[in-house]
Regions:
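Hydrophobic anchor residue at the start of the ABC signature
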Residues: 144
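Conserved ABC ATPase "signature" region
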Residues: 101, 108-126, 178
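Helix-to-loop junction immediately C-terminal to a conserved catalytic motif
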Residues: 54
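Short coil-to-helix segment of the ABC ATPase nucleotide-binding domain corresponding to the Q-loop/switch region
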Residues: 90-98
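The feature captures the beta-strand-to-loop junction immediately N-terminal to the Walker
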Residues: 39-41
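Conserved ABC transporter NBD signature motif
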Residues: 62-73
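A short, flexible loop at the N-terminus of ABC-type nucleotide-binding domains that lies
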Residues: 1-3, 12-25
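Conserved signature/switch motifs of ABC ATPase nucleotide-binding domains
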Residues: 129-132, 150
Length: 258
């Protein structure tokens, strides 16, 4: 039985002639431990769908169920955004431990758990720093550590590497690849990058231009644990070209609508 089921979800904004359908009749399932990537052109509803899964946004119709129970809040999922939204006056370890603090976990224990999560991301030496003292990539690592400390059943990631430089992006991709494999996390990951989706995902849901629909579901056949060097293989490049063939027309249509 799937961990998460998205059942005929439609999201619309406004009414009458100004009504805008962002997501149209989307159905998906996500298995336990699966890494599902949502891939599509700008404005196709990827982030909107993720917000519905998180409980931050209500669907116009359809429903989202977790273990057959309808989702009514975001308590069993945690979102990692493009910007990590760290609280500027809190130390990094206190930012990471925020969810534990809200649960009433004692201070010493939550700091210990925060430092352990920061170790996984390679920035434990910066636990006592403040967000303004860290680079963008390090702040994003702290945001990922904060999500891991919360130990959600589903980790939702909305283009988390879009705001960092190319070298940092590659490092973060490799870290997330290793961590999600080692921790057996269930992940829904939004991206514009075909390469990123193929590197990280078990499946890729290719979305159409607005209104966003599922155009294709691609099984990513590369075994796990996955080596980042698969990007250099002929099979990877063939899949990348196949997905671009699916997306080319959608990207052009999205560009005309902006």
């Amino acid at each position: 039985m799937p961990l998460l089921t998205i059942d005929h979800v439609t999201v619309a904004f406004g009414n009458g002639p100004r009504k805008l359908v962002a997501v149209d009749d989307v159905s998906l399932t996500v298995e336990r431990g699966e890494f599902l990537c949502l891939l599509g052109p700008s404005g196709c509803g990827k982030s909107t769908l993720l917000k519905v899964v998180s409980g931050l946004l209500a669907a116009h119709s359809g429903r989202v169920t977790l273990d057959t129970q309808e989702r009514r809040d975001g308590l069993e999922s945690v979102m990692v955004w493009q910007e990590p939204t760290l609280i500027p006056w809190r130390r990094i370890d206190d930012n990471v431990a925020l969810s534990l603090e809200l649960r009433g976990v004692p201070r010493a224990e939550r700091r210990e758990r925060a430092v352990e999560a920061l170790k996984l991301l390679g920035i434990a030496d910066f636990a006592a720093y403040f967000p303004r003292q860290l680079s963008g990539g390090m702040r994003q690592r702290a945001g990922i550590a904060r999500a891991l400390v919360a130990d959600p059943r589903i980790l939702l990631m909305d283009e988390p590497f879009a705001a960092v430089d190319a070298q940092t992006r590659r490092i973060l991709q490799e870290q997330v690849l290793m961590l999600t494999q080692d921790l057996h996390k269930t992940v829904i990951f939004v991206t514009h990058s075909i390469e990123e989706a193929l590197l990280l995902g078990d499946r890729i849901a290719v979305m159409s231009a607005r209104p966003g629909r599922i155009k294709a579901l691609i099984e990513v056949e590369f075994p796990r644990p996955r080596d980042p060097h698969i990007v250099r293989t002929a099979r990877f490049q063939d899949l990348e070209e196949h997905i671009w063939d699916l997306l080319r027309g959608e990207a052009a249509r999205a560009e005309l609508e902006t």
